[in-house]
Amino acid sequence: MNFLFRLFSARTLLTIIFLSTGFARPASTRQTPQPTAIELSKKETVASAFLRSMAFQEYQVRSAAEAMPEELYTYRPAEGKFKDQKPEFGPAEMRTFAEQVKHVACANFGFASELNGDKPPEGCDKGGPDPAKTKRELLIYLRNSFAVIRKSFTAINAKNQFDPIEGPYAGPNTRMGLAVVVVWHNADHYGQMVIYLRLNGIVPPASRPSPPPVKDTY
């Protein structure tokens, strides 16, 4: 997944910085008093900082996946097929919505494996080895991937944050560097999923006046 770095545009970087500062939050949390910077500085850890950012990304991605009707999981923007596309710039045809969901889930599992020192699943760029296909199966796969990455994040601390991480997905890297990639990778694909929803007249849950909670079971 080294090609991801070539896709990491300035716009994506600004988005991640904006999100990580806490200025952008789901509408459902805007009325909840947020801790001050001083309060955070007294209790914040490396793990909690990443977990806070990841919680927002998890809500965005999972709620978007839930909002898309199953019959539109095969939807692919018609303008997403490019002629004379260079292979090194990625596939010539945009993913279907289902492929977006599956890619994010597989990538989360892959990143978690690398953070844990395990072998990651192969072929996440093309969906990976998991057989999930229906909307329900993909939602479960996606939900489980976030649970796994959260667990991996909890193991990051001040002593190991700069430990070397090898692997095909965003490697070589450090533990902290890879955690940053995990957050922006989810934000990147959420931005694409939003377009799919909007093109079908669906307002992303995170953008609604009263965002609904994500489901625990499917």
Where are these regions (language model features)?
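Bacterial N-terminal signal peptides
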Residues: 10-22
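Solvent-exposed, charged/polar functional surfaces in cytosolic regulatory/catalytic domains
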Residues: 56, 60-63, 67, 148-155, ...
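Acidic/histidine-rich alpha-helical segments that form the ligand environment
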Residues: 130-166, 174-188
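Bacterial Sec-dependent signal peptides at the C-terminal "C-region" and cleavage site
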Residues: 19-35
